[in-house]
């Protein structure tokens, strides 16, 4: 991806989005591309899956690839839920799907390697961002080409983050002025902060289909000397 030329803002070559939608997480549902979400965060476990490829302990994780697994965790401790093991009477991790990577065996075992450091669910090593608790749709219209695209975005995403989502449709999106109802958008603000209200609850209250009215952002091309 080329740099942004004369347009003010972050260098999109290194730009990192903060939020991911559940639909985006769901797309990463294979052992070679494995994401999960839990407790409001999104994690890329692809490297973990590659490191334990062929290991039976990976099976419960592969089965939930692309899904939210918050129910595996105690929200207070952010650790795997625990229970009293009926066989040993000891407090152990609760794994209804079966024991998985980094969970100790039920009984003492001499061949269990515990030199991996922190378990994969502790710390932020695999974290790639936050899970959008609420999403909304927004239309983006390129006034130069009359092309229109509808994106699902997180309500807490800035316009810069929405622009980053839009890049697959227009690699020069940063060379445009983004406007709503004739006013320039503050690219560091969210849609709501820019006056683009989320009216989903009002439509629900009125028993109306909210998809019939999706706000539109208009893009106006700037000749900023970037490559066309």
From Swiss-Prot:
It comes from the Eukaryota. Keywords: Cell projection, Cytoplasm, Cytoskeleton, Heme, Iron, Metal-binding. It is found in: Cytoplasm, Cytoskeleton, Cilium axoneme. Gene3D superfamilies: Cytochrome b5-like heme/steroid binding domain. One of its GO terms (cellular component) is cytoplasm. GO terms for biological process: cilium movement; regulation of cilium beat frequency. Residues 17-83 form the Cytochrome b5 heme-binding domain. Heme binds at residues 52, 83. The keyword Cytoplasm applies. GO terms for molecular function: metal ion binding. Disulfide bonds: none annotated. Belongs to the cytochrome b5 family. Radial spoke stalk protein that binds heme under oxidizing conditions. Required for the coordinated beating of multiple cilia maybe by functioning in a redox signaling pathway. This is Cytochrome b5 domain-containing protein 1. It comes from Pongo abelii (Sumatran orangutan). The gene is CYB5D1.
